[in-house]
Amino acid sequence: MKKYDVIVIGAGHAGLEAAFATSNLNLQTALITLDEKGIGMMPCNPSIGGPAKGIVTREIDALGGIQGKAADATTMQMKILNSSKGPGVWAIRAQIDKIAYQRWFKQQIKQQKNLDLIIAEVSDLLVENNIVKGVILSDQKIIQADYVIITTGTYLKSITHRGSVCVDEGADGTKNAKFLSDVLVKLGFELIRLKTGTPARIKKDSIDFTNMVLEPGTNQKIAFSHYHPVYKPYDKQLPCHIIYTNEQTHQIIRENLNKSAMYGGMISGIGPRYCPSIEDKIVKFSEKPRHQIFVEPESYELDSMYLGGFSTSMPIDVQEKMIRSLPGLEDCEILKYAYAIEYDAIDPTQLYPSLESKLVNNLFFAGQINGTSGYEEAAAQGLMAAINVSQKHKNKEPIVLGRDQAYIGVMIDDIVTKGVVEPYRLLTSRAEHRLALRNDNADDRLMKIGFEIGLLKPEVYDQYLNNLKQINEVLNWLKTTTVGQIDDLKFTTLKTNSYLIDYLKRPEVKLNDLLIYCPIKIEDEQIINKVQIQVKFEGYIKNQEENLKQLKRLNNIKLHGIVDYKEVPNISLETIDKLNKIKPLDLEQASRISGVNLTDIAMIKYYLERIKND
């Protein structure tokens, strides 16, 4: 068969991002997948974005990746999350038409140069002298390549669970990968067993929406893609709805806990902390009288609704009782029952920050096989693995994004340095520099890199540079124009020799209020938004940078005075659990524990100072 520069195993979100990046970088690429049904599939929540994750998709786009364009082209609803808070946590979330999303990618694959799609199962890796040379398919055909990127998602020896019923299959009834786990073990890789799950799907026409809380989208023009945006008109967007569990729901779950695959002992894999099953919520948060559930559409073409926040591994008969105890779903028709899925992943500490294996040269890993969760996290890793394949092919140094450069850098540093014990999810709290890692400035942080490596098209980069020029011109005007020079502003409480940039820092003042006096005509809302954020939050960003410098000097502070970390205020349950288990000797050791961030370290330091002074 034809020899390729790169083979990508798996056509999920990591694999697609990797394959499009390598082929766009002029590397002959083979994309191998078990089943065409799995291309770009969204087996769980059909959405892209959310806190931290939406910023990651913006970062992917800034580097020249494809996920943002796909999401914009197939969205059913767009929202800006956390808009009432500071810009460090603003994020875009899109409800995606999962049928259109897959169709979009399949069409792009057909049109993509340097990319061949192969429907087959990889049964072995060709490795000589610790260098990967290609793959062997299950029909014994050999495909040679200089590099291999493994992006098998949740399919390695995957098993689905509904109560005591276990099925040897992949997500949504697809085929699973039966051979690669054993191949990796023989090569010396340590594997971990993880678990995730997905809720039931309900027939839309059987739902009573009367008493549900309506969750519409936004009429603002927002998109993931910086310079190729596709906007979904407000009147074409589909609404989501919110309902809540009740005591009847909780009682059904409590009475049947032993039938749950997870609580009945059928599942050994560790599930995601930040996306727990409904059983987990009832057990771990027993004091809560109700839990929120999102009722969300899956496609313009499907009459199915997704119950976000209601995943379970209960048997079918129990699921029916649980679902019909929910308001509006009393007489619903269940189209597909929930399930949990177990799968193999590698310990990601066996990877370099480039995502290349430490054990086998030219072998890269990306996505959920690295112990992460989420479409956005997967796509970001696929992109970075592809970029570093290209860098190595050109005999250049790998591109490793810093924690202060991108959420992508935070994630990769976390998983390769600290490893994972549960499916890793990106959170804004994991980033020490989150005021600098904003939704609005992904282009400032990463477009130069995307352009220099050859992924970002020159015309896109030129447009970015033109926008940057306008931003700097407006900032210069604000810095050099005094209040006294504007007749309408002479009677403000600011001194007339104060500059407009100081006036703009007032919370009640908007940049649009001042631009009417500006000789530079700016109409692009993206430019206006970026200038306003830079000015209004300049002080916060400088303070955060200073705090980070101080926190780096805390390494010699001992922790033997803390018996139980529940005593420490304002740290998460995850942090408490891990600190109580590991019992770090000092703050330096505590800071290296997965899930413990610099905010937690600051809270611990404050607590130690307080008990010392008491």
Swiss-Prot record:
Query: Which residue pairs form cystines in this protein?
Result: none
Q: Which residues bind FAD?
A: G10, A11, G12, H13, A14, G15
Q: Where does NAD(+) bind?
A: 271-285
* Places the protein is found: Cytoplasm
Q: What keywords does the record list, in alphabetical order?
A: Cytoplasm, FAD, Flavoprotein, NAD, tRNA processing
Instruction: Look up the record and report any one GO term of the cellular component aspect.
Output: cytosol
- Name any one GO molecular function: flavin adenine dinucleotide binding
Fill in the subunit field for this protein: Homodimer. Heterotetramer of two MnmE and two MnmG subunits.
This chain's function reads: NAD-binding protein involved in the addition of a carboxymethylaminomethyl (cmnm) group at the wobble position (U34) of certain tRNAs, forming tRNA-cmnm(5)s(2)U34.
Task: Please report which protein family the annotation says this sequence is part of.
Answer: Belongs to the MnmG family.
Q: What is this protein called?
A: tRNA uridine 5-carboxymethylaminomethyl modification enzyme MnmG
Report the gene name. Answer: mnmG
